[in-house]
Regions:
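Surface-exposed loop/turn motifs in large extracellular/passenger domains
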Residues: 1-10, 19-37, 45-63, 71-97, ...
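Beta-rich catalytic cores
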Residues: 15, 40, 66, 101, ...
Length: 188
């Protein structure tokens, strides 16, 4: 979808307020997902190998119990990129919130690859103000940040990023040219 807005959609007792993708492929370019709400993935859920390729798109004020904007599970993959130049280029996660984990993104047993120009700012959750990563039993979560900015995100634990692994699970992370600025955690 190019130039598309998903606004104020609600999944009352389930996942993916805006989009539910189980094994499908989503492409978002120059779009907006704002004020969507769900139990998991206020804007989007990726499960069963579902993928999302996101370029120059804004996720703002989405809310969920887990994953204010994205809930990623069962080999789901989120990739962001910048297709333009200037201050508005890149993908923006702004003011998303989760009552429990992952203000912007919750990933368990999946992959998050945030490319150059991706900004996560003002997101909030109890654990992982911007991102919560969980390596579930005998599975893994993979995080890659390249040219990513984390600013003014907040949480009780992990103002920007919180990761945890269950027995037999792993969380793998790689980062280059990343800026963490003004993120806060009240308990560590």
């Amino acid at each position: 979808a190019t130039g598309t807005t998903f606004r104020k959609n609600v999944a009352t007792s389930n996942y993916g307020g805006g989009i539910y993708s189980a094994g499908g492929s989503i492409v978002l370019v120059d779009s907006r997902m704002e004020e969507n709400k769900a139990a998991g993935g206020g804007a989007i859920i990726l499960a069963g190998g579902g993928t999302a390729s996101v370029t120059d798109t804004a996720f703002a004020a989405n809310t969920a119990t887990n994953g204010g904007a994205f809930f990623i599970d069962k080999n789901g993959v989120l990739t962001t990129a910048s297709g333009g130049v200037g201050t508005d280029a890149g993908t923006l996660f702004d003011g998303n919130s989760a009552t429990t984990n992952g203000g912007a993104v919750y990933v368990q047993n999946g992959t998050v690859d945030l490319g150059s120009g991706t900004r996560l700012q003002g997101n909030q959750a109890a654990k992982g103000g911007a991102i919560y990563a969980l390596g579930g039993k005998d599975a893994s979560a993979k995080l890659t940040f390249a040219g990513t900015v984390f600013g003014k995100n907040s949480g009780t634990y992990g103002g920007a990023v919180y990761s945890s692994a269950s027995v037999g699970g792993t969380v793998n992370a790689a980062a280059s040219d990343v800026v963490f600025e003004g993120n806060t955690a009240t308990s560590g």
